[in-house]
Amino acid sequence: MYRTLGSIALLAGGAAAHGAVTSYNIAGKDYPGYSGFAPTGQDVIQWQWPDYNPVLSASDPKLRCNGGTGAALYAEAAPGDTITATWAQWTHSQGPILVWMYKCPGDFSSCDGSGAGWFKIDEAGFHGDGTTVFLDTETPSGWDIAKLVGGNKSWSSKIPDGLAPGNYLVRHELIALHQANNPQFYPECAQIKVTGSGTAEPAASYKAAIPGYCQQSDPNISFNINDHSLPQEYKIPGPPVFKGTASAKARAFQA
């Protein structure tokens, strides 16, 4: 169940800009994340990442976990518990926040996040309502991602109620849109063992592959934030957010 982190070389210049998740608080317990500028062989819950620089293509395999290759440890949490991720630094105030989970088919040691198994547990965009909204591009503070710039650089999400137990990856993703038509993706992954006796699992309509949940040409990915002649709208990419028991009940009612 445990794996040792491999070593990876980093350029010091990568620390000068952008950012990455470097710590977590899960179910009230603090967990250090991977520190790319510290000695190798770190026993942490987070998949190692190469640097603070973005993934620039929606089809790049690194989009899944920023090139991460596994972790030695995992956190334990129950449905309804809170996951808080903290970034060491963050400077971009326009774009969405997406938080995903993925149920591993077995042990973490063989879990690579492949296939259409990723589901969102949280998202925030312009004013954080997760729907198409009119966007005032001259007011970057209208984006919830701006809270990472002016606040403590942390974002909290809840594990879906009634989520079935098992080994999961949790993936935090920031998509910076401050450069028109040139999106920047910042994903990191960590390992969580969900406990309890829940039975809620997302249906196929809530799941997606990463990469694959979006295309580079999508209007909400290659987004011209500076073009005021266009209808100023933004819809967060990907499937709807899975809320666990509530989502399962809603689906059963619709059926």
Curated annotation (Swiss-Prot):
Q: Which CDD domains does the UniProt record give?
A: LPMO_AA9
Tell me which UniProt keywords the record has, alphabetically: Carbohydrate metabolism, Cellulose degradation, Copper, Disulfide bond, Glycoprotein, Metal-binding, Monooxygenase, Oxidoreductase, Polysaccharide degradation, Secreted, Signal
Q: A Gene Ontology MF term for this entry? A: metal ion binding
Q: What is the effect of changing residue 184 to A/E?
A: Decreases cellulase activity and O(2) consumption
The observed outcome of changing residue 178 to A/E/Q is: Decreases cellulase activity and O(2) consumption, with decoupling O(2) utilization from substrate hydroxylation
* Cofactor(s) it depends on: Cu(2+)
Q: Which GO terms describe its biological process?
A: cellulose catabolic process
Protein name stated in the entry: AA9 family lytic polysaccharide monooxygenase D
What species was this sequence derived from?
Answer: Thermothelomyces thermophilus (strain ATCC 42464 / BCRC 31852 / DSM 1799) (Sporotrichum thermophile)
Q: What is the lineage of its organism?
A: Eukaryota, Fungi, Dikarya, Ascomycota, Pezizomycotina
